[in-house]
Amino acid sequence: MIDGLEEVPLQPAEGELPDAVRDWLEAAAKVSSDFYGEGLGRRYYRYVPSDPVVVYRAIESLVVRRELRGRRFCELGCGFGIAAGLAELLGFQACGIEWEEDLCRRSRELRDRQGLAFKVFHESYLPEGYEVVQGMGGKDLVVPGGPAAEQPMFEFLDPADIDLFFVYPWPDEEEFMAQLFRHLGDEAAVLLMYQGEGEISAWRGRE
């Protein structure tokens, strides 16, 4: 249960993955292996990849069940852009936002080698003026102008255009990411949140 959001049911399919998806995941696994083999997991200790098959099946379910208004996808904190690539393979116009320059570079190199076209923005997913503070139970979002603030804009992206946001937050950031989604997304947008150990859920703002 996430305050202010309504859960969207998921019915993940089973069976074989499409060849293009398997190829993408194999290439992504190689990048991830090299990354940790270089000892960079200690440098970027907050980067932990989600289970890509679980993510793929969840996005696929939202498409099959017609839960989405359109096919525009944004991965917040995209790391290697694995989810953005999966979304593109499912027919989305996809992008990712990542603050760490090295992760952006690796995601773009992976994308280009595999012939995909999703965009990777080397930016913060916090709009200008928004801040994160440590609250009693985790991180909280500070919104300029308070709850009645207008929907934010990025210089590089209009979040109101996004139909599906994806994020894998740390446990103490789940409520913060839900707060951010309530400001970024419009009433038709869906937030897909990976919650670790194969758990994933989808949410939409209450009407």
Region locations from a protein language model:
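C-terminal substrate-binding/active-site "lid" region of AdoMet-derived donor-dependent transferases
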Residues: 164, 171-207
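Short alpha-helix immediately C-terminal to the canonical SAM-binding loop
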Residues: 104-105
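Conserved class I S-adenosyl-L-methionine
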Residues: 69-79
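Conserved SAM-binding loop of SAM-dependent methyltransferases across substrates and taxa
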Residues: 80-92
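Conserved SAM-binding motif I beta-strand of class I
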Residues: 93-98
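S-adenosyl-L-methionine
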Residues: 1-69, 108-159
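Residues in the short beta-alpha loop(s) of Rossmann-like NAD(P)-binding domains
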Residues: 100, 110, 197
